[in-house]
Amino acid sequence: MSSPEKFSPAPESNSNPSLPDALIISCIARVSRLYYPILSFVSKSFRSLLASPELYKERSLLNRTEGCLYVCLYLNPFESPSWFTLCLKPDQALSSETSNKKKSSGYVLATVSIPHPRLVQRSSLVAVGSNIYNIGRSISPYSSVSIFDCRSHTWREAPSLPVELVEVSAGVLDGKIYVAGSCKDGDSLNLKNTFEVFDTKTQVWDHVPIPYNETKHNIYSKSLCIDEKWYVGAKRKVVSYNPKKGIWDLVESEMCSYKSSYDYCEIENVLYSVEKTWRGTVFRWYDTELGRWRKLEGLNMPYSGTGDRGGKKMIWCAVITLERRKNSGIWGNVEWFAHVLTVPKTFVFQKFLAATV
């Protein structure tokens, strides 16, 4: 079985491109980000241009920004995490626009080369624009915050949390990162809840007051943002916070039914969840108006599980388009479904995120 997908770089060219950098940037800015990992092997000068701020300014001016998938894995539990990004295979890049072949064979997770990798944990990784924020590190307690720039693939430091947290979970709403966590309660061995908010524009932390006694007796370690509210959960209880009104509310317990794991995400202000059953993989979405989970119609996904492939595991990826229909909920359609990466069987999945670049 093959090892994680890697592309072999082409021999370096001895001559520099005769075209000026500004013209090359203007051309590359019009190309989908799916091609960038392949273009990076053209030459060192190309690699430099692909990470330049000028390129992404041009992409923004041309309205060519797009969502890019990033995946974080621990291939070895004793090593730093590895990052991957979804791209086109080299043998598909030039022909994908005109070929009649199915798209399912044209995508792969390519390794992202990072000079100084950081320790991460899934609940504390969030994407805001072209940046991925790592709230704290894997060593507890922690308060450090770092930013992964998805344009240059480099880390930089951000202002630390005002308190040291033992547990942490983060969500994004209107460009602000809302963090739920627990910290030591004075000199006692008990833990107390603390909620903080980080403005990514001003790079300033602020405290979110906790008015309910309910939140003072439960350690809230999972959070997300939908419907212009920040939802924070612990076990079978969920509270929501409306930042514009400064109001906390208790939420129906139904929301916790299929959100007990990390197999959930928010897409265009709707919460989706995935559950593995003996009948197959079931997708659901949460109807905030009715206060209950509803099945995502139109999908017939096979049961997903794990199996030994010569000491390796295969990671598969699916792209599902979503359509909201009148009086019939939300429907899904599988665009493509394919094997995108082979990893050691000891790997540990952390998180996948979509950054806008």
From Swiss-Prot:
SMART domains for this protein: FBOX
Repeat region (Kelch), residues: 131-175, 177-224, 226-267, 268-313
Domain F-box: 14-61
Coiled-coil stretches noted in the UniProt entry, renumbered to this chain: none
UniProtKB keywords: Kelch repeat, Repeat
Pfam families cross-referenced by the UniProt entry: F-box, Kelch_FKB95
InterPro entries to which the protein is assigned, alphabetical: F-box/kelch-repeat_ARATH, F-box_dom, Kelch-typ_b-propeller
Top-level lineage group: Eukaryota
Protein name: Putative F-box/kelch-repeat protein At5g38680
Organism classification: Eukaryota, Viridiplantae, Streptophyta, Embryophyta, Tracheophyta
